[in-house]
Amino acid sequence: VKSVGNFTGRMVGGLGLWNVYFICKFFLTQLGYLRLELFANIALFCFLLLPANSKGMRVLKQLIALGCGIALLWSESWLPGPQSIMANATGITGFSVNYVLQLIWDFINWRMVFAGCAILLIYYAARDFIRVTAVTGCWLLFLVVSPFFGSAPSQQSNLVPQTATGKTAVGNPTDTAAALAAAKGTSQGEASSEEIDKWYQTFIAYEKDRVAKFPDSIKPKDTPFDIVILNICSLSTDDLIAANLINNRTFSQFNIRFDHFNSATSYSGPAALRLLNGACGQPSHDALYDTRRPECEIMNRLDSLGFKQHLFLDHSGVYDNYLNAMRTQAGLTAPFERRRYPVKYVSFNNEEIADTLSVFRHWRSVVNKAKDPRSVSLFNFIALHDGNRQPGKSRWEEFEPRARAFIDALDVFIADLQKSKRKVMLIIVPEHGAAVRGDRIQTPRLRDIPSRRITQVPVMVKFFGLNKLPKTPVHVTSDTSYLALSTLIGRVIETNYFSKPEGAVPIADLVNDLPTTHMVSENAQAMVLEYKGKDYLKMSKGQW
């Protein structure tokens, strides 16, 4: 009897500070910051109650519990897992020490830290009056049984659905299109992982057969023009809203604006490959690195029609094997137009970043010297990338002043193009956002999860050399991606659009019935898609 009493006494001795661990997790789950693994937490709870007869055993038990507790907390959070970190190891090792320290500091959510301290103080104040372990155990038991009574606290993420209007593009069998279109509806309940996986495979198969229509050749009498594509790193629609720049007057000068354009990824390398392979439907992330498909390579298709290729960067293209990947995975043959530019920023990996306006003006000198009747120029800018700082400064510069400086340079470039009288199709198509605001599942500046805030980017088109175009932009309100943009370029060529001052056809006709693409975004270790009015997330090989 004495032995049983001693055992019971040790059992009811309580969890001690582990109560704070569990209670904090319960609150974080209620707020949507965690996805609580109930049975794993029960196992940890019970393990902590096991008796330890010696000091050495008690220390060992606490060390084991500490390791398990940290691993469990990490797995329940939305933080990148080990697989994601390893997949991005090459890029991470390029970060400067100063940038890493700033990321760690900025990662801390001070409101949550203060809330945790408050819970700790309450625990110390209450532990002499109530059995806190009993409260924690009852709370955990409630979380286990409450789903059976329909009162479980929400563990849903903050991936807010924002359904856009539009119709599914035609071109495949009716039943496949209908199956994809069904996902545009709404549903009160949640879809199963098996249902979403099946729909995703249907989506990928459908997209694989879609190809943008380009003319076979250009007639000798057709009016020549230049195509300029600005691929901008770290600029989403949500970033512009957060920086109060969404209504900047520079954007009002554009003729076409895509309101729901999905870049389909949140990293630069895959974004570049998706753009360069944008003359086809949307491939999976893994397919970007498979066998090349020449019919998808928009720069090479334009080259075959007589558009001379040029490439301009405000960086070296070395980081993360960026330039080499574009050449080997997307067949980019454009010569890299190098010049010694004035330095505007120093990047997170200590690389010099060129002055934006200087890069723009280099284009004019290159095309004027080349004297090609038609050209297509791809620009890639990283001036807005997180972690950039002014030369000589140690602290990174905020997004908003860098974005304003970039837009100001763009405004000057637009004015230069207007003065030049050149016929130009200027296209802005950002890679992805900077995650200026973040959300409950991902802190600001982190882009491991390609959420809608990061992948919905402000794509715009402006025509130069035509003086009778409408003053107000035409908005494309359906869900679109790179295939729609490639199709638009094909229509501009096919209609000989620059042959008349008002355009060969109305702008509304150019964008009418452009191919739509369902909102599906992927990185190597995370996927986000919209299905029946809700956004779903899949981490690595897990469940939706």
Describe the role of every protein-language-model region.
Residues Y497-W544:
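Phosphate/adenylate-binding glycine loop and adjacent helical scaffold
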Residues V1-N172:
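Transmembrane and membrane-interface helices of multi-pass
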Residues Y289-C296, W396-F406, R447-T455, N467-I489, ...:
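A short beta-strand-to-alpha-helix junction
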Residues D320, W363-D408, V412, A435-L446:
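Active-site His/acidic residue clusters
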Residues P153-R389, Y482, T487-V505:
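Active-site-proximal alpha/beta segments of enzymes that process anionic O-linked groups
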Residues R404, D408-D411, K462, T487-G490, ...:
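Marks the mature luminal ectodomains of secretory-pathway proteins
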Residues S3-F7, R422-K423, V429-N467:
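Histidine-centered active-site microenvironments of extracellular/periplasmic hydrolases
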Residues C233, L302, F379, L410, ...:
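Generic structural signal for small/hydrophobic residues in well-ordered secondary structure
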